[in-house]
Design a protein with these regions (language model features):
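Terminal, basic amphipathic appendages of nucleotide-handling enzymes
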Residues: 1-130, 170-172, 226-235, 584-595
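Intrinsically disordered, low-complexity regions enriched in proline, serine, glycine
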Residues: 72, 571-574
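Electropositive polyanion-binding surfaces
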Residues: 90-534, 540, 555, 565-572, ...
Length: 595
């Protein structure tokens, strides 16, 4: 949305102003602007609207809905970030003109509709990119990873393709999605829905007992998904707490066995394993009903390992063919941040293995981070409940020592996965690089249109890396807003206490970030600590009282009181109700703002 200059467009909230109404910027500081009466239309006080500035007044362009409705708030957030949910009319027309399934008469498309194929997705998912089939062959497991054949429905250069390239990826916010592809494709013709024949590109692999992947083959196929399984449902089956749907128990158990083999092989070659979680929301028509933090479960791991194996197999094939494509690159960590990570974790009492003296090379840095991750995981387990509360904060330190992954046309590698060649093949419904990978793969197999050239791959890699970063920022912001809406409601209904046990998760000069309750986060300004002048620790892992030496460190327990919730901005301000004892093992002084 336009930010500067006369006549700019922005998202605002309708507020009362004397005898009239005004529009106050919803997501940024700014003075209220008197609404032009002729443009007010159906807008009411409390509504979120898009407006165009007209001097000191504003003209309503569209009404998004009241701030009490999560759907309206999410629509406003997307509009504020210039993310379109609806596709241009030319894209919609092109999608609606597709009569139905296109691959029925394709020469060479294999009929695998007799296989047992399953999808495993989050509850509520509608765009099903991938499905799995599996069979035992002696000691080996033959794995088929079926991915939606989006390239069959989206020819290069068409209206759908141009818009998908511009968007780069889908953007997911609580309760809705801004899809890369029009819904006619993303949730219908390309989605691997149960009970419907769908066109796919299949990666067939043999998983050996030691996790080695051999005999990789790629081809176009047609499948019939037997069942739409969910992560919680598969977790219950794997835990023995539930039965798989009839005829699917072997598929689930064999897929889990394949995942265990693949995971063990990845860990043996030095892959990095980091535990983290993201909030998952239940959204009602008029409120955020609930939120839970979803961590990595056996069902998540099952799907992830199979997808990684397929991505690596396609990458190896494209490298061997020296064919242009878009790779996923995760650079080895730099030495200085890793050395600092070791200092931070040791200061916080985490037992770590010895690290080499002097500068670390890329390989040494990667091995050191992997060793730190293993030690940190063991330390968190050893701390029991205290470790569980501090886990996200400690893992956050490790993640901040790593470089960010991005797309590139160059064959390099993926440090975190310890993979010599890696790309994204498994999500062409929601990621444009995956669609380019499909086109290049099918071209090399001689069963598709010409694939992208090197220039197209380079341009798409740069653009998609940028849109991915933007999407991550928007999604995190939307999560904060949804959590603030939930917290505001629970406090208003007195369904949650205003005082909560929390854990320090981050520190800046201005104060502390604190996780509290089961899913909430807030900021505790340093001015509210009281009783002393607090200065940042030299390693940026806590605050230290200048007079008392009192330390409040990352991972420490702290009881907090909610002071203010600014839901639209996703801000929660806290104050200390009581400070728990610091768990850090050493005592050092530091200076606020100085190092």
């Amino acid at each position: 949305m336009a930010r500067g200059g006369p006549g700019r467009v922005l998202v605002a909230q309708v507020v009362g102003s004397g005898r009239g109404v005004a529009a106050r910027p919803a997501f940024e500081p700014g003075r209220p602007m008197q609404l032009l009466r002729r443009s007010q239309g159906d807008a009411r006080i409390g509504d979120l609207v898009t407006v165009r500035e007209r001097g000191r007044s504003a003209e309503v362009l569209g009404v998004l809905g009241p701030t009490t409705r999560p759907a309206a708030v999410m629509a406003a957030l997307l509009a504020d970030a210039d993310v379109r949910v609806k596709h241009p009319s030319a894209v919609t027309r092109e999608a609606e003109a597709i009569p139905g399934r296109l691959g029925a008469g394709d020469p060479g498309r294999r009929d695998l509709t007799g296989q047992v194929a399953i999808t495993i997705d989050p509850e509520g998912a509608k765009d099903h990119d991938d499905a799995l089939s599996i069979a035992r062959e002696g000691e080996d497991l033959r794995l088929w990873v079926h991915i939606a054949d989006v390239a069959r429905y989206v020819p290069a250069g068409g209206a759908i393709d141009r818009e998908a390239a511009r968007r780069g990826n889908s953007v997911y916010v609580p309760g809705t999605v801004a899809p890369m592809l029009p819904r006619r494709l993303s949730t219908d013709l390309c989605s691997l829905r149960p009970g419907e024949v769908r066109d796919v590109v299949t990666a067939e692999m043999l998983v050996r007992p030691d996790g080695t992947v051999d005999d990789a083959r790629f081809f176009r196929a047609a499948i019939l998904s037997r069942e739409r399984l969910t992560y919680p449902g598969v977790d219950a089956v794997l835990a023995g707490a539930a039965q798989a749907p009839p005829g699917l128990e072997e598929a689930v158990t064999l897929a889990a066995e394949a995942a265990r083999r693949l995971h063990a092989r990845r860990m043996a070659r030095g892959a990095l394993e980091v535990t983290s979680g993201e909030p998952a929301f239940t959204i009602g028509p008029d409120r955020v009903e609930s939120a839970v933090v979803e961590g990595q479960t056996p069902a998540h791991s099952l799907v992830e390992e199979c997808m990684i194996a397929a991505n690596e197999a396609v990458a190896r094939f494209m490298v061997a063919r020296k064919a242009p494509t878009v790779f996923r690159y995760h650079e080895d960590p730099a030495g200085p941040p890793v050395l600092r990570l070791y200092e931070q974790l040791e200061e916080l009492g985490v037992p770590l293995p010895p690290i080499a003296d002097g500068p670390l090379g890329p390989q040494q840095a990667r091995e050191a981070v992997s060793a730190a991750a293993e030690a940190l995981g063991a330390h968190i387990v050893a701390l029991g409940e205290d470790g569980a509360r501090a886990a996200s904060a400690l893992w956050g330190l490790l993640l901040r020592s790593l470089r960010q992954a991005y797309y590139t046309p160059d064959h390099v590698g993926h440090s975190g996965l310890a993979s010599a060649a890696y790309l994204h093949f498994t999500s062409p419904i929601r990621r444009y690089p995956d669609l380019l990978v499909h086109r290049g793969l099918l071209d090399q197999l001689g069963i598709g249109d010409p694939g992208p050239d090197a220039s197209t791959c380079a341009e798409a890699a740069a653009h998609s890396s940028s849109t991915e970063r933007d999407a991550v920022g928007i999604e995190r912001r939307a999560d904060r807003v949804a959590l603030a809406l939930l917290l505001e409601r629970l406090l208003g209904e007195r369904a949650i206490e205003i005082e909560q046990d929390g854990t320090v998760t981050g520190v800046v000069d201005a104060g502390l970030f604190v996780a509290f309750g089961d899913v909430f986060d807030g900021f505790l300004p340093v001015r509210r600590l009281g009783g002393d002048w607090y200065r940042t620790h030299p390693l940026d892992i806590g605050l230290v009282g200048e007079g008392t030496g009192r330390r409040v460190m990352i991972g420490d327990p702290i009881r907090v009181r909610v002071v203010r919730v600014e839901a639209l901005r996703g801000r929660v301000e806290l104050e200390p109700a009581a400070l728990g004892p610091s768990r850090a093992l050493t005592r050092r002084r530091a200076r606020l703002g100085g190092r």
